[in-house]
Curated annotation (Swiss-Prot):
SUPFAM superfamilies xref list: P-loop containing nucleoside triphosphate hydrolases
Record-level GO cellular component terms: HslUV protease complex
Function: ATPase subunit of a proteasome-like degradation complex; this subunit has chaperone activity. The binding of ATP and its subsequent hydrolysis by HslU are essential for unfolding of protein substrates subsequently hydrolyzed by HslV. HslU recognizes the N-terminal part of its protein substrates and unfolds these before they are guided to HslV for hydrolysis.
Originating species: Ligilactobacillus salivarius (strain UCC118)
Protein name (database record): ATP-dependent protease ATPase subunit HslU
Tagged with keyword Kinase: no
PANTHER family found in the cross-reference section: ATP-DEPENDENT CLP PROTEASE ATP-BINDING SUBUNIT CLPX-LIKE, MITOCHONDRIAL-RELATED, ATP-DEPENDENT PROTEASE ATPASE SUBUNIT HSLU
Annotated residues for binding of ATP: 20, 62-67, 280, 345, 417
Length: 467
């Protein structure tokens, strides 16, 4: 595992490609990330004493709080989970256990390590997968096995702690004709001539697998997936193309080539040293002076979160994970409460406060046009699939930005999400009628914008419901 060594300036430059404005938040989060890299470079005895400087991002919805954290995790290839503080309950109440956020992080880290390991062994796994495909396409007769020998093998498997092979021995009688045909098929597979041919393979039945993330047991942190590995796997036959079957077989062969224990150790280290946990709506659990006696204590949730943020050991199915050096980012609008309403101990664990600014008209214009895959580019591409060439004039984009700013100011401030609502209403007719009409080139002008949504914007009561 290699920690990303981008400088804060490089990190901010990457974030600028996707998030408009909010320079102070980008700088703070870039410095926090760089400090983790700096800690890794220090002697071991000093590393343990340096804890991450957790951030508290304050600002209304839709200004980029979550997007900054999510994009950051992708830039540095770090395990990232987003949780909502309101989904957790204190110990003794029904609901998600706060420790599940750390378990989710380790699960993400394990998948990342697994994907990295699979990439390294893919070439070898592909060779084995192609050999299995050849045998599936050109099957050979099975050897008749002595019943006594089959019983002996079953008892031997049980004694070794594994389940007996109910399908009997896989030994084949390979004749000269079969061998020659397999050589021919192997050559055709190598040249990619059989990719669209159909083949039947056996895969694990998904209905027999435990889903650890659903139901009350998953919320309580009880891991059922470990039980599934102790149960015999039920196989079902599926018919698919050779290309699809190869990917499934490559995955199966990769699992054989990779040591799961090594992956678990690497996942724990990756989560501990580079993991990011984003706690959204943390303002909703801030204690208030008036609270009903029957209401689940918000302060209780804070006190349950506190030891995880401070640093503790949490049991996961991959082993114990220490949260001492995981970066926590709290986020909230703090409309009805203040950061000082959080318990003092939790406030102290989020020493860096960053206030995100409301979006201006210029910000909305940039959001519409500048980022990679900006909103306007997305809609142009989607409508283009119906052979309609849509263009927006500069005046139209400015008008859309002005409408978004005005509506956020006059009604509820939902930030950049307002643009989605406006564009959907603006392009409603094109999106509906486009597949059935040969419209050719369409230019979205300021007059077009005013015609489609101008009357709705002027009627404040109507705009509250539609835009």
């Amino acid at each position: 595992m290699n920690e990303i060594d981008k400088t804060p300036r490089q990190i901010v430059a990457e974030l600028d490609k996707y998030v408009i404005g909010q320079d102070s938040a980008k700088r703070a989060i870039a410095v926090a990330l760089r400090n983790r890299y700096r800690r890794i470079q220090l002697p071991k005895d000093m590393q343990e004493d340096i804890s991450p400087k957790n951030l508290l991002m304050i600002g209304p919805t839709g200004v980029g709080k979550t997007e900054i954290a999510r994009r950051l995790a992708k830039i540095v290839n770090a395990p990232f989970v987003k949780v909502e503080a309101t989904k957790f309950t204190e110990v003794g109440y029904v609901g998600r256990d706060v420790e599940s956020m750390a378990r989710d992080l380790v699960e993400v880290a394990y998948r990342m390590e697994q994907n990295d390991a699979f990439k390294q062994v893919r070439a070898q796994a592909a060779q084995q997968a192609n050999k299995r495909l050849v045998k599936l396409i050109v099957p050979a007769k099975k050897k008749q096995e002595n019943p006594n020998q089959y019983l002996f093998n079953a008892l031997r498997d049980l004694q070794s702690g594994s389940f007996p092979n109910m399908n009997g021995n896989d030994m084949e009688e390979v004749t000269e004709d079969v061998r020659n045909e397999r050589l021919s098929v192997a050559e055709q597979l190598k040249r990619g001539l059989l990719e669209n041919n159909e083949v039947t393979i056996q895969v694990d039945d998904p209905s027999t697998q435990f889903n650890n993330q659903s139901g009350m047991l998953g919320q309580m942190g009880i891991d059922l997936s470990s039980l599934s590995s102790m149960m015999p796997t039920k196989k079902v036959e599926r018919t698919m193309t050779v290309a699809e079957a190869r990917e499934i077989l490559i995955k199966e062969e990769s699992e054989k080539l990779v040591n799961s224990a090594d992956l678990a150790d690497a996942a724990i280290k990756r989560a501990e040293n580079t993991g990011i946990i984003f706690i959204d709506e943390i303002d909703k659990i801030a204690s208030k002076s008036q609270q009903n006696a029957g209401q689940v204590s918000r302060e209780g949730v804070q006190r349950d979160i506190l030891p995880i943020v401070e640093g503790s050991q949490i049991s996961t199915k991959y082993g114990l994970v220490k949260t001492d050096h995981i970066l926590f980012i709290g986020s909230g609008a703090f409309h009805e409460s203040k950061p000082s309403d959080l318990i003092a101990e939790l406030q102290g664990r989020f020493p860096i406060r960053v206030e995100l600014e409301d979006l201006s008209v210029d910000d909305f214009v940039k959001i519409l046009t500048e980022p990679n895959n900006a909103l306007v580019k997305q809609y142009i591409a989607m409508i283009g699939t119906d052979n309609i060439d849509v263009t927006f004039t500069i005046e139209a984009i400015h008008r859309i930005a002005e409408v978004a700013y005005q509506l956020n100011h006059d009604t509820e401030n939902i930030g950049a999400r307002r643009l989605h609502t406006i564009l959907e209403k603006l392009l409603e007719d094109l999106l509906f009628e486009g597949p059935d009409m040969q419209m050719g080139d369409i230019k979205i002008t300021e007059a077009y914008v005013n015609d489609k949504i101008g009357s709705i914007v002027e009627d404040k009561d109507l705009s509250q419901y539609i835009l």
